[in-house]
Amino acid sequence: MRILVTNDDGIYSPGLWALAEAASQFGEVFVAAPDTEQSAAGHAITIAHPVRAYPHPSPLHAPHFPAYRVRGTPADCVALGLHLFGPVDLVLSGVNLGSNLGHEIWHSGTVAAAKQGYLFGLSAAAFSVPLNGEVPDFAGLRPWLLRTLETLLRLERPFLVNVNLPLRPKGFLWTRQSVRAYEGVVIPGEDPMGRPFYWFAPRPLKEAEEGTDRWAVAQGFVSATPLRLDLTDETRLQPTLAHD
């Protein structure tokens, strides 16, 4: 099996290499990741200028994987990775430093990279861990990465799955996407030159429902949410719907 690994935190993120190492237990791994952080980049692709890629060494004390540092978005990395490395069977994105739960998948570069792989007809999965002031212990999470990958690889292909791991998992659950409505908080500030700036600091408005991704992670479970890309509202496609 040939596996392409990417992320949105950038090629220097420890989560990227933790996922690459875990994936190497299942096949031949190739890495193509952004040269700078691309968090919340969504499914943007670069069309206004060329995308550049540079060979990149694996970190010290890590297995060697063919890797490129890409001056582009997470979705760019998948498209370019398939060009540079040739066909693959699986696209993995992460492990993101920060959860991607509920409506966060709309703007997540991590999930978008997996979606890009799925758009090419490939099986794909995104992996994330929460950031709450504690540094993730990727060595401790390794058994759960392996167990989750084993579970995913038993699915009918192609699949698209969003995986969120708590910092100390106690089990695995299949979940549905939560509804994460936000209060849009804008925090103003001023730089030393007297120019205004603004931070966006959204806060969730309600508790997560049981069986959802956010609920599962809060309870200490690895959450795996199968996704689809068809956004059609089937309830509005009634046979009696008039055509203009």
From Swiss-Prot:
Binding annotation for a divalent metal cation: D8, D9, S39, N96
Family: Belongs to the SurE nucleotidase family.
Organism name: Thermus thermophilus (strain ATCC 27634 / DSM 579 / HB8)
Record-linked NCBIfam families: surE
Known EC number: 3.1.3.5
Its biological purpose: Nucleotidase that shows phosphatase activity on nucleoside 5'-monophosphates.
Name of the featured protein: 5'-nucleotidase SurE
Listed cofactors: a divalent metal cation
Subcellular location: Cytoplasm
